[in-house]
Amino acid sequence: MIGAVLAGGRGKRFGGDKLLYRINGKPLILYTIERLETAKKIDEIILVASKDNAEKLEKLGYRVVVDNLLIGPMGGVYTALSLGDAFVVAGDMPLLVPEFVDFIISEFKKSGKTACVPRWENGYLEPLHAAYSSAFREVLEEKIKAGNYALNRAIREVNPCYLPIESLPEEWRESFFNVNTREDLGKLHKG
């Protein structure tokens, strides 16, 4: 399965390009990529980026696919699925847990559903830490044509496989940690 790392976003809250911000000499996005590489069920890693970011990200040595839609996460997922089924993760999730990725992919394949998404007890979804079938792209295309860019709404409409987060190993939850501000980097150093 493809491991698609979304490298969109403008880093407004962070105050710059957070994905290339260096932590201990290494760009933030590389922490996510390196953890994803150790997931056993990932065959290939691609980066989904805007045209503006593509050249900078190509220097990391991974295949970069350009998201020309620029409509947020839905556009990134849509672009990734043009290459086949994919596990999609945001590039700012440096504590990604490879065993959790493998678990999601296994459950996705067992379920036969279009999407397999972790869900919190309160109903909140983790759509940028989920597995999708390339068939989900057709659903997204309809939404995009209609101007509806809410990824969670599209997911809910396809009767996905939900993974109840509270019933999974607690240590896997660090996988959802994402960096939005420079203060978050402090949490990363402590963790």
From Swiss-Prot:
It comes from the Archaea. GTP binds at residues 6-8, 18, 67, 92. Pfam families: NTP_transf_3. The gene is mobA. It is found in: Cytoplasm. One of its GO terms (cellular component) is cytoplasm. Its EC number is 2.7.7.77. Its cofactor is Mg(2+). It is an enzyme of class 2 (transferase). Disulfide bonds: none annotated. Signal peptide: none annotated. CDD domains: MobA. The keyword Transferase applies. It catalyses: Mo-molybdopterin + GTP + H(+) = Mo-molybdopterin guanine dinucleotide + diphosphate. One of its GO terms (biological process) is Mo-molybdopterin cofactor biosynthetic process. This is Probable molybdenum cofactor guanylyltransferase. Transfers a GMP moiety from GTP to Mo-molybdopterin (Mo-MPT) cofactor (Moco or molybdenum cofactor) to form Mo-molybdopterin guanine dinucleotide (Mo-MGD) cofactor. Keywords: Cytoplasm, GTP-binding, Magnesium, Metal-binding, Molybdenum cofactor biosynthesis, Nucleotide-binding, Transferase. Belongs to the MobA family. Its main location: cytoplasm. Mg(2+) binds at residue 92. The keyword Metal-binding applies. InterPro entries: MobA-like_NTP_Trfase, Molybde_CF_guanTrfase, Nucleotide-diphossugar_trans.
